């Protein structure tokens, strides 16, 4: 029997601590409360909602997960699966798939939903593209997703490093399809530089997540801009009409059905081909609280709505994540593996 939907809960948002935080040390991770305490917003007195029956993750048995983790550590590589505490990590790792996170483990942003560490990043590792390409070849991957932390400290936002990774993978694994999940390249001239650089070696799928509806950006994505993200997606598509574009949105942060539908319309109006829709899960008690658990029936309704808008592929469900079954999503959108 389907459980009734949890009611929306009130959210009290207060300004962050006005006292000057301690200076960031290069390469030192600020996680959990240390990270969120640096955010311009804090969340207080939010009741904890019990997870419904459809929010469950099966933990596979066997050594595949540990073997893949060992391979990643051996090559000094990082996955967003681990750094962002993705609930699907065991399923993906047990099938030998992973979403690689380049440009370090420290992000310059402080998004309230994200479990990736904040701080002052180290310079990019020049050996990372070769290590990544060797690992992809060793694993025999036919489809790989490469993402990164935000690098507001770099003039190109890390675009050249993305291109170096794409080129290295293609040199050693020419039949592997590559999806990149990029930051927003926000900043004066940064989007222009990033798009110019990415044109040198574009991916097979370009993914940038819108994350949430525009009204929630101040609380969820401080430092980001809704229209900027839409423009990035549209400009890439205009430059590369034959390359699939993709975005993702989380539910459960306080949005309404009407707001989600409006965001889907905005994405299609900006020439986005593929969309993922999934339930937000709070990574620690310090992060943005879960305001509501959307039901499987609502996810199905959004899938139908997205298909009617003309997306080439809609992945909508409680446990859907941007990179979850990315190869199947791409195949569904006509990207050959």
From Swiss-Prot:
<keyword id="KW-0949">S-adenosyl-L-methionine</keyword>
<protein>
    <recommendedName>
        <fullName>Lipoyl synthase</fullName>
        <ecNumber>2.8.1.8</ecNumber>
    </recommendedName>
</protein>
<keyword id="KW-0479">Metal-binding</keyword>
<comment type="pathway">
    <text>Protein modification; protein lipoylation via endogenous pathway; protein N(6)-(lipoyl)lysine from octanoyl-[acyl-carrier-protein]: step 2/2.</text>
</comment>
<dbReference type="InterPro" id="IPR006638">
    <property type="entry name" value="Elp3/MiaA/NifB-like_rSAM"/>
</dbReference>
<dbReference type="GO" id="GO:0016992">
    <property type="term" value="F:lipoate synthase activity"/>
</dbReference>
<keyword id="KW-0808">Transferase</keyword>
<dbReference type="Pfam" id="PF16881">
    <property type="entry name" value="LIAS_N"/>
</dbReference>
<feature type="binding site">
    <location>
        <position position="86"/>
    </location>
    <ligand>
        <name>[4Fe-4S] cluster 1</name>
    </ligand>
</feature>
<dbReference type="Pfam" id="PF04055">
    <property type="entry name" value="Radical_SAM"/>
</dbReference>
<dbReference type="InterPro" id="IPR031691">
    <property type="entry name" value="LIAS_N"/>
</dbReference>
<dbReference type="InterPro" id="IPR007197">
    <property type="entry name" value="rSAM"/>
</dbReference>
<keyword id="KW-0963">Cytoplasm</keyword>
<keyword id="KW-0411">Iron-sulfur</keyword>
<feature type="binding site">
    <location>
        <position position="81"/>
    </location>
    <ligand>
        <name>[4Fe-4S] cluster 1</name>
    </ligand>
</feature>
<feature type="domain" description="Radical SAM core">
    <location>
        <begin position="93"/>
        <end position="312"/>
    </location>
</feature>
<dbReference type="GO" id="GO:0005737">
    <property type="term" value="C:cytoplasm"/>
</dbReference>
<comment type="similarity">
    <text>Belongs to the radical SAM superfamily. Lipoyl synthase family.</text>
</comment>
<dbReference type="InterPro" id="IPR003698">
    <property type="entry name" value="Lipoyl_synth"/>
</dbReference>
<dbReference type="GO" id="GO:0046872">
    <property type="term" value="F:metal ion binding"/>
</dbReference>
<feature type="binding site">
    <location>
        <position position="111"/>
    </location>
    <ligand>
        <name>[4Fe-4S] cluster 2</name>
    </ligand>
</feature>
<dbReference type="GO" id="GO:0051539">
    <property type="term" value="F:4 iron, 4 sulfur cluster binding"/>
</dbReference>
<keyword id="KW-0004">4Fe-4S</keyword>
<dbReference type="InterPro" id="IPR013785">
    <property type="entry name" value="Aldolase_TIM"/>
</dbReference>
<feature type="binding site">
    <location>
        <position position="92"/>
    </location>
    <ligand>
        <name>[4Fe-4S] cluster 1</name>
    </ligand>
</feature>
<keyword id="KW-0408">Iron</keyword>
<feature type="binding site">
    <location>
        <position position="114"/>
    </location>
    <ligand>
        <name>[4Fe-4S] cluster 2</name>
    </ligand>
</feature>
<feature type="binding site">
    <location>
        <position position="323"/>
    </location>
    <ligand>
        <name>[4Fe-4S] cluster 1</name>
    </ligand>
</feature>
<feature type="binding site">
    <location>
        <position position="107"/>
    </location>
    <ligand>
        <name>[4Fe-4S] cluster 2</name>
    </ligand>
</feature>
